[in-house]
UniProtKB/Swiss-Prot annotation:
This is Phosphatidylserine decarboxylase proenzyme. PANTHER family: ARCHAETIDYLSERINE DECARBOXYLASE PROENZYME-RELATED (PTHR35809:SF1). It comes from Rhodococcus jostii (strain RHA1). Binds 1 pyruvoyl group covalently per subunit. Is synthesized initially as an inactive proenzyme. Formation of the active enzyme involves a self-maturation process in which the active site pyruvoyl group is generated from an internal serine residue via an autocatalytic post-translational modification. Two non-identical subunits are generated from the proenzyme in this reaction, and the pyruvate is formed at the N-terminus of the alpha chain, which is derived from the carboxyl end of the proenzyme. It is found in: Cell membrane.
Length: 237
């Protein structure tokens, strides 16, 4: 994202202030859920500062966690009826499947796009459409590798149903993976989420499934890389 120009007459910052300003503009902010994972190794680095290997290892760990929990700014498209990717990653499946039973969306298969997130991807989840949250259901389960087809059915998951102003129901499901053992969902029933708004996070490798109403035109392709909140993956009927 480009930095905003400085208005005329604005007092110029000091060289140190200017450097800090540049860093803030270039480095993505950190999701709050990542703070403990960054602060803990930083504390170890401080306590073990006299031992070079401890200090370096702890700082490396803190940097890796900061990269994992990064929360970059995104600009969703301003078009009616589009569905954006709820996560960064690779499209693993473009098919039809029965939505999670806990969402009460029926037993008929609906269009689905599954996105697999590696440990190197941004791991926050964003609302694929703008709408009201009508259901949020967490279901315990297994921790199979998230790229397996069975993961949607047997792994731990958090399912959320959104009702758009146009009357469509879109479901987005956070699925835990082999390393992902903690699903965070900040959205609650009754909340209204703008398209692309961050609502949750899955720690360390995961998958996100999106279910659409019948008649939706799927635009995503298997193997495609997605950018959460920006890549259009479907057009609602």
């Amino acid at each position: 994202m480009a930095r905003k120009p400085t208005p005329p007459g604005t007092q110029q910052p000091t060289s140190v202030g200017h450097i800090l300003d540049l860093v803030r503009g270039a480095v993505p902010p950190l999701h709050p859920a990542g703070l403990p994972f960054v602060l803990a190794p930083l504390g170890v680095a401080v306590l073990g500062r006299k031992r070079k290997w401890v200090r370096r290892g702890a700082l490396t760990s803190a940097a890796a966690c900061a990269a994992f929990f990064r929360h970059p700014h995104r600009v969703p498209p301003n078009r009616v009826g589009v569905v954006v990717a709820p996560a960064d990653g690779e499209v693993a499946l473009v098919d039809s499947a029965v939505p999670p039973a806990e969402l009460d969306m029926g037993t008929e298969p609906l269009p689905r796009v599954s996105i697999f997130l590696s440990v190197l991807d941004v791991h926050v989840q964003r609302s694929p459409v703008g709408g009201e949250v009508t259901k949020v259901v967490h279901r315990p389960g297994q921790f199979l590798s998230a790229d397996l087809a069975d993961a949607s059915e047997v792994n731990e998951r958090n399912s959320m149903l959104l009702h758009t102003p146009e009357g469509h129901d879109v479901a987005v499901v956070q699925i835990a993976g082999l390393l992902a053992r903690r699903i965070v969902c900040d959205a609650k029933v009754g909340d209204t989420l703008p398209i692309g708004d961050t609502y949750g996070l899955i720690r360390f490798g995961s998958r996100v499934d999106t279910y659409f109403p019948a008649g939706t035109t799927l635009l995503a392709e298997r193997g495609q890389r997605t950018i959460g909140a920006e890549t259009v993956i479907a057009q609602l009927p």
